[in-house]
Amino acid sequence: MTNMKNIVYLSVASLFILISLTYLATTPIWPFNKEDKFAQCRNSKVTGGSASIGGTIELVAADGSTVSDFEIFSQPSLVYFGYTFCPDVCPLHVSRNADAVDMLEERSIQTTPVFISIDPTRDTQEVLQEFAKMIHPRMVTYTGSEEQIRSASKAYRTYYKKQESEDEYYLVDHSTITYLVLPKYGFVEFFRADTSPEVMAETTACFVENS
């Protein structure tokens, strides 16, 4: 009788183990197996995940109309927050972005260099349009009210602060990150100031081709 009980117990235990192993083998364990279609493209890691950057924003386009993020990012976009009176880093970074756009165009990938001004007082529509012409023929620029710009900056977790000065040639401290934003997906990647245009182009191409 004892042997029979042992056999029954062993059979039940074996069945339980088999069911458990089958469940583990066929059930995805979140978040470790969560699919990321862009995993092979990513060079950076965002604290809180990519969903924590971007979202709904409103800005003012070159024609004076108010536009949403859906209109701003209708194409794959390389987005930079800066100001036209910036004496050094802004021209370097947006020119680098323009070079990446040209490299992508050689691969038949259309991207838009986007410039969002953090200095609405001096960056009028006329000033922004002249700035865009100097950088790239497809560059689009946006401005807005202080509140609109602050909201967009917060959405993309950028930093900017106007230096205290009565001089009209005041400087604005700001972060120097460029963001890759895709239609339907929103923010997907960021590029630091020292990223080369070649790396930007290669990474952007990977995201676009897998979108």
Language model regions located:
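Thiol/disulfide oxidoreductase modules built on the thioredoxin-like
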Residues: 148-203
